[in-house]
Amino acid sequence: MENLTNISIELNQQFNTKEEAIRFCGEKLVEAGCVEPAYIEAMIERDQLLSVYMGNFIAIPHGTEEAKKLVKKSGICVVQVPEGVNFGTEEDEKIATVLFGIAGVGEEHLQLVQQIALYCSDMDNVVQLADALSKEEITENLAIA
């Protein structure tokens, strides 16, 4: 996977709601200097417009089109959630065990989403990320993508 110079990896996280999970991803992007704090609200708004759940136990929280002006540099936050977090409803659960919070300058945003979606379309890759015991293991798995 290309363009992973600004990457934050968080292992063994737990969230009660998808909003809490999205905010966590956004905060990591802010801490990395990738986005302005207002980008976090745009990530919540984006999920309300169209779910950021992608299937295969993966969610890709990211901001709205209008929030691109809040992106300082491209970055990604990989968050492992062993117990999962529901991005669906009680009736139609959509459990994510790996989150990819992303911010992309210009068209890099779309490229990041496409790269992650392609990589995670293989369940073996998702399992490796979900079961990784170290940040280095996740970095290695993503580097070969």
Swiss-Prot record:
CDD domains membership: PTS_IIA_fru (cd00211)
UniProt KW keywords: Cytoplasm, Kinase, Phosphoprotein, Phosphotransferase system, Sugar transport, Transferase, Transport
GO biological process, one term: phosphoenolpyruvate-dependent sugar phosphotransferase system
Localization per record: Cytoplasm
A Pfam family matched in the record: PTS_EIIA_2
UniProt remark on domains: The PTS EIIA type-2 domain is phosphorylated by phospho-HPr on a histidyl residue. Then, it transfers the phosphoryl group to the PTS EIIB type-2 domain.
Protein name per Swiss-Prot or TrEMBL: Mannitol-specific phosphotransferase enzyme IIA component
Gene name as annotated: mtlF
